[in-house]
């Protein structure tokens, strides 16, 4: 949708010109001496950065439209012809119908402690019929209680009306994002449901909701819950920031193949205070110990039902591994206390040339423990795309 601003300029002398440098259409009257010049200024309603900070966003629209949307003007845009309109909802049961809107806890920016157990539901209506997905950016997501074995006491569930819904998450997820597929009909909606089981812990959430059109270059492939772009980046499992792998996870983390790149390398994130790879479940974890273990012929990772899956990996992405006990030539499943394709005590990078690039996490519905009966953290993996021909 484009905003039309009608400026009326009274010209008293022939030859006077409009000072506008935006896209304009001029309409001249018949009177050459007293001439009304109408300039219709068009600018798209794009995401803008508010004056409150570089990570707070709004939509560039007119002042009057911002007021009609119950937003607040925070800085100007479109060469001063528009305002950056900040929009947010925080009351349980609220609905939103505009792009670039925040969903926040009641009383935000203060924390929120519910007085009773129950749910808090927000509804997202499509801003246009061309919208296929929502992208949720968790600028703040903390205080959602989760037990030391991964069971979700508090949770957030996002649901659309088509495709597979994202997993229900809990714990600390500040800085993460999530894609939600919505239906094809213009009246289709999506919901975010907060469920409170712990009424003693203060919670805080500030979720930026972007509506992604079907033709957008940033539309995620089907069933990609996290979608990363760029030749380098870091993929983290939900809850890792709070040192907790969540039970009942089943979702894809996808990386867009950039132009001129044919392979990808993954390795543990270094220098973190949180264990970068700890994927265990409540089976006989003594057989896994604290070493990395790829999918074995006796199916240890599959048997425990908690694992990271990466298609067709090897040390160089091309050559199969030497025949070894319990390690297939192109491992696909990873679990244990170190990431890699070695059963030693050192994590190893792995490569894959199979596209699309995809890291899948599956965790058992049974709460997860490591071999020392303490919480297992999940994973944080750095990726680097590899140019074709290398």
What are these regions (language model features)?
Residues 2-390:
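Domain-level representation of secreted and single-pass membrane ectodomains enriched
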């Amino acid at each position: 949708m484009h905003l039309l601003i009608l400026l009326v300029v009274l010209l008293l002398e022939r030859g006077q010109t409009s000072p506008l440098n935006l896209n304009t259409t001029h309409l001249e009257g018949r009177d050459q001496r007293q001439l009304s010049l109408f300039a219709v200024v068009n600018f798209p309603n794009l995401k803008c950065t508010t004056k409150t900070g570089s990570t707070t966003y709004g939509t560039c629209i007119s002042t009057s439209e911002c007021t009609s949307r119950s937003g607040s003007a925070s800085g100007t845009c479109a060469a001063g012809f528009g305002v950056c309109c900040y929009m947010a909802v925080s009351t349980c049961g609220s609905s939103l119908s505009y792009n670039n809107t925040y969903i926040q806890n009641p009383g935000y920016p203060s924390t929120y402690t519910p007085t009773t157990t129950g749910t808090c539901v927000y509804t997202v209506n499509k801003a246009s019929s061309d919208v296929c997905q929502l992208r949720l950016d968790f600028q703040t997501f903390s205080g959602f209680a989760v037990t030391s074995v991964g069971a979700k006491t508090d949770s957030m569930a996002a649901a659309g009306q088509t495709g597979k819904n994202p997993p229900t998450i809990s714990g600390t997820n500040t800085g993460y994002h999530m894609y939600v597929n919505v239906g094809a009909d213009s009246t289709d909606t999506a919901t975010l449901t907060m469920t409170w089981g712990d009424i003693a812990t203060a919670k805080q959430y500030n979720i930026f909701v972007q509506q992604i059109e079907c033709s957008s270059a940033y539309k995620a492939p089907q069933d990609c819950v996290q979608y990363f772009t760029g030749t380098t980046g870091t993929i983290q499992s939900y809850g890792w920031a709070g040192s907790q792998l969540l039970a009942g996870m089943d979702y894809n983390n996808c990386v867009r193949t950039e132009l001129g790149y044919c392979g990808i390398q993954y390795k543990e994130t270094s220098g973190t205070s949180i264990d970068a790879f700890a994927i265990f479940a409540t089976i006989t974890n003594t057989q896994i110990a604290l070493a990395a273990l790829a999918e074995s012929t006796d199916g240890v990772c599959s048997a425990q039902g908690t694992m990271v899956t990466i298609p067709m990996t090897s040390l160089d992405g091309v050559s199969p591994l030497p025949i070894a006990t319990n390690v297939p030539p192109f491992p696909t499943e990873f679990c244990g206390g170190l990431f890699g394709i070695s059963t030693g005590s050192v994590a190893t990078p792995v490569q894959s040339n199979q596209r699309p690039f995809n890291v899948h996490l599956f965790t058992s519905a049974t709460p997860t423990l490591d071999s020392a009966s303490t919480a297992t953290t999940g994973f944080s993996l750095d990726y680097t795309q590899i140019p074709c021909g290398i």
